[in-house]
Curated annotation (Swiss-Prot):
Compartment(s) of residence: Secreted
Paired cysteines (S-S): C42-C74, C70-C121, C112-C130
Entry's induction text: Expression is inversely regulated in male and female in response to the male-specific pheromone cis-vaccenyl acetate (cVA) and is dependent on the active neurotransmission of cVA-sensitive neurons to second order olfactory neurons.
Tissue specificity of this protein: Expressed in the antenna, mostly on the anterior surface of the third antennal segment. Expressed in auxiliary cells and the third antennal segment and exported to the sensillar lymph (at protein level).
SUPFAM superfamilies, sorted: Insect pheromone/odorant-binding proteins
PANTHER family per record: GENERAL ODORANT-BINDING PROTEIN 69A, ODORANT BINDING PROTEIN-RELATED
Protein name: General odorant-binding protein 69a
Top-level division of the source organism's lineage: Eukaryota
Pfam families in the cross-refs: PBP_GOBP (PF01395)
Amino acid sequence: MVARHFSFFLALLILYDLIPSNQGVEINPTIIKQVRKLRMRCLNQTGASVDVIDKSVKNRILPTDPEIKCFLYCMFDMFGLIDSQNIMHLEALLEVLPEEIHKTINGLVSSCGTQKGKDGCDTAYETVKCYIAVNGKFIWEEIIVLLG
């Protein structure tokens, strides 16, 4: 279960293809392969555009495309961070993330919890939108860069 949550954390970074080879981040190649496979599965399943994702990261704007919303849901679902009732469980990442960012994660969980939407895709999107509103700097500069 811990590996599954850690893989999700990596998935966010890999999702945006932002891990530079010179960053010094050592990631198990097996995990990268697994995450990329799940990323492709979610891209194929939802029809989300890699170009739209890349542009959103570059411009720090969360796209409102239904496919992107469902892509977020798919990734959260694949890594066990959203349950069958569409409740987010970001706090599960505390098991695998460095202690120095626990306070930030707890702040996001406390401030946002689960932002209910009309369905799972919309719930994932609204919750991520809240995370960005509460601590966009952390989401865009720390999470996305680490996972990229």
